[in-house]
Amino acid sequence: VAYGKQDRVETSSAFSAISGEELRKSQVSTLSNAFFGRIPGLTAMSKSGEIGYDEASVWLRGQHTSGDNGFMILVNGYEVSGFNQITAEEIESITYLKDAPALALYGMNGGNGVLLITTKRGRPGDGKLKISVTGRYGVQLPQYKPRFKGSYEYATLYNEALANDGLPAQYTERQLEGYRTGNNPYLYPDVNWYDEILKSSGHIQDYTLSFRGADRFVNYYVMAGFMENKGLYKGTDGENNSNIGFQRINFRANADIYITKMLTAQVDLGGRIEDRKFPQVGTGTMWKNMATYAPNLYPVRTPEGYFTGSAKFPNNPVGNLLGLGWSSRHAYDVQATARLTHKLDFITKGLSAYAGIALNSSYQNGYAKTRQYAYYEPIYTKGESGADEVYFEKRSNDTDLSVWTGSDSETSRMYLQAGFEYDRRFDGDHHLSGLLMYQQNTRSVLGQQAIYAQQLIAGRINYAYRQKYLLEAVVSYNGSENYAKGNRFGVFPAASVGWVISNENFLKDNRTLNFLKLRASAGLVGNNRGASRFAYEQYWGIGANKGYYYGTAVKYYDAFVQLALSNEDLTWEKSAIYNAGLETRWFGNRLAFDIDVFLENRRDILVDNRNSIPSFSGIGFSTPVNKAKVRNYGTEFSLMYYGQAAEVSYYAGGTFSFARNKITASYETPRAEPYMYRQGHPVGQPFGLEAIGFFRDESDIENSPRQAFTPVRPGDLKYRDQNGDNVIDANDEVAIGRPTVPEINYGIKLGVEYKGFDLQMLFDGLTNYSLYLNDYNFWPFVNNANISDWAAAGRWTPENSARATFPRLTTQANTNNYRSSDFWVRDMSLFRLRNLELGYTFTPGK
């Protein structure tokens, strides 16, 4: 639990825990990618597959706010910036704190949830030194490669699109035949850019060496690990260019030192050193070009092996990969902590005092070797016989590699803690424990003069009577220098109660129901993420396009102007959280079922006040104000069964989480129609037009509301007139689809073991969220883009108008079809096998 430990039976607050052993079942390069489907209430979603930058996006009980939904991550009691600096191999357990009593000790920092990461330590029973060596090697395969048309179909469909636009065909029958036969790949290229750039697989490997032991005076754990992840790009040599690569060395040394019977010391050191290397061209650009470059744009190389290109498209995707050089990022993160604990039994039994310090340093630096490559443009001509011919003209020159050293980025944190802990049982019936602590922390960033600083005073009392009736009360007083004087500190109270019904006499010896606990909690927590630095202050400076014109020549002069108004009432977000839970164990503890329900009312969310400033004031800037509110509610449960049949042991179970939010107060621009307001909808709800099909013919167009964006033709998207004014425009936009954060996530775990062999499977699923297809990747022929198989197969034509699933093809940036509408929204629900593991355990002496 927060800043301490409690007996789970006597805990009345809500939390979930997972062991490091469970996390290690997934071979991943970043810790967050091991969370999928494993922790109730925690949603993990992949946003990128780029090696070294593939951390999952994580939400704790969904979206709490329209601001920053980031949460606290603590390693051995002290905050860290993210998951990257720690690996599953060094983790003993992760605890997810959920309700107000569990979070209130963190004051204005705990509102979005807290993850407590506890690393491995030596244990008094470990005895002599134990050495552990682990090694794993894995192959990574691309889950899916988009499918696009080859040159013959591309050119044929491009002619169709031109005809739809009322324009003449671009490709002749001779050219179409050349693309179809593929006999001259330089004159009639047919390039699959994905196949030219991507390999069939990459690899990941990691190795760990650890030492663990204990004696009368010290318990210790020491670990060092190495991980390497190589990407999918072809043909790279590592000197003139580079595949995507990620290497990490991580280390940890934890020690508990028994100085005297009354005084113990805890010393921890952990960190990582990382190196990322990648092509000079950005990953986003690389993948966009692979998806949009036409297959007949030009061949990859000339007959002599030089890269090709053109004036309009000089960036040959393969040339960009192999000919521009490479970039790298070096980073390290080190956390060192020390804590002294002294028993004060001479004052009263169970009392102790402690003091601790934590230092954390993070550093990043960039380095690159860059160059330019020569490209040759294909020139198409007619030969003496009238046949099509091609030759290549050089348009640029090769350059040597040049070295670039990027700027440094460095952040340092320091935490100081001191406090008293109390833990005592009276007469076997009463258990009283408590905590009173003080903490201050500072964070400095290279290049910034002002230091981030916070102070915290917090207390907690826990009482249990005969392990049946439970009570917890928490309060903290927390402040930040990021707010105006007089408005920097806040009080965060919370309380919970619990009833262990299975310890009552009428259930105590029940053989079916072994454990039953009810609990409920309420309290106030805060969230100070999202506010910019000293946002309460007014700012003056040289504003862009804020100057004046003087003189007969009407010359422009910059001006020193006000850029932001002052708002000294600015404060943090506040959440009233209510939670109720049930924990059960059945059939000799073989079946476990836990469930929680929650309601959170978030207020004082920062929004822009621009909408409240009259335009005649001449003020062209805004000031953040605490005006928005969000309600978030949901449930989560876990179910697990462990069984044994002869020599076969097995388990089956899973987790389920649901979290839904609604904006209950907003500060938005007055809108033309009630259905256009964001209030009443979830955070991040997309808005757009409602598509009701395609125009069938000119008669259909004439008898439908006028679509004001551009003249339409048969096969264009047709939209619903929401307000009945017989015009389709921006005032007809309604809520479409769902936000991009899943409301529901679930996981299923299955396993079986027989005579040392074991098989384990993990499935995970996400649902109730959408993706919006909104760029050239999905718009055929716009800017000479490629066309996908699904667009070609579903395109509208007069012959298949009743079966069409895609608008008519066009070479224009059609402002009617390619605007925000539910036609481009896709349900992203998924269910997949996340992890499959087959193993055998060797037992010495057998």
Which positions does each model-derived feature cover?
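Extracytoplasmic gating/loop element in the C-terminal half of outer-membrane beta-barrel translocons
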Residues: Q170, A294, P299-T302, G319, ...
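Short, small/polar-rich motifs associated with maturation and membrane association
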Residues: V1-F251, A265, N723
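Extracellular/periplasmic, surface-exposed regions of secreted and cell-surface proteins
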Residues: L23, G70, N254-I273, P279-G282, ...
